[in-house]
Amino acid sequence: LNSNDKSLVGHSVLAIIPARGGSKRIPGKNLKTVGGQPLIAWTIRAALAAKCVDRVILSTDDSAIMAIAQSFGCDVPFIRPKHLSTDQASSVDVVLHALSTLDQGFDIGVLLQPTSPLRTAEDIDGCVKQLIKANANTCVAVSPVAHRPEWHGFIANDGCFDPFRVSRSVSKAASDEDVYMLNGAGFVFRTQSFIKNEVFVDGATQTYIMPEERSLDIDTSFQLHIADVILTPDIHRDPSPK
């Protein structure tokens, strides 16, 4: 391992960055310029700076993304098959393919989506350490939710607001306690358990709490703009832990 942290001794950690070429909502999203460099570069830099990660690989079907990733020092050991690069392909399938293709003895895996450019190396290390500390099979990055569950809902065909059906007990708990959501910044798992169960979240998933200011998950052009505004002054920001 790259760390002197005794809690990490005996563990080998693989970081997998998934980045297919076909993005419907934001075409070419992974290579869009954010803060002066391609969006995917922020995740690659953080992963390479993480002390707990032994190897960082990219899973992509796109030659342009591959070239950019390699220019930032990311390993691209294979080309992702087309059937795993569609809208229907799941992240679970992508990770299973990566693990089976590499066929190496990593006991912990980390899925790092390029859409979380504000995530730091310290966040990656924290998520992995939490999994090890709790002796859990899975750990996910989460962030506080600003709005209570019952404030969300659908708009019916007649234009009326149809709120989520939240029980009184859940509503009270939400008002008394903090509510959290998966922020997409990190999914950590023990590889053998993942191969067997094929899930990132099970009944005993641990959490690594991240603040709102590092939890942006880019899914729209507006969110891409927000990330660009935040990161533009930080083009030389060191993603390594302080």
What feature does the model see in each segment?
Residues C52, F72-C74, N157:
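Short, structured coil segments at secondary-structure junctions
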Residues D93, H97, P117-A204, M210:
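Conserved core of the sugar-phosphate nucleotidyltransferase
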Residues A15, L58, L111, T138-A141, ...:
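Structural beta-sheet core signal
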Residues D5-L8, V179-K242:
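Conserved alpha/beta core of the MobA/IspD/sugar-nucleotide pyrophosphorylase nucleotidyltransferase superfamily
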Residues I57, S63-V110, L118-E122, G126-K129:
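Short phosphate-binding loop-to-helix
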Residues S12-S59:
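N-terminal glycine-rich phosphate-binding loop and ensuing alpha1 helix
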Residues V53, Q104-F106, N135-A136:
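Short, high-confidence coil segments that cap the C-terminus of an alpha-helix
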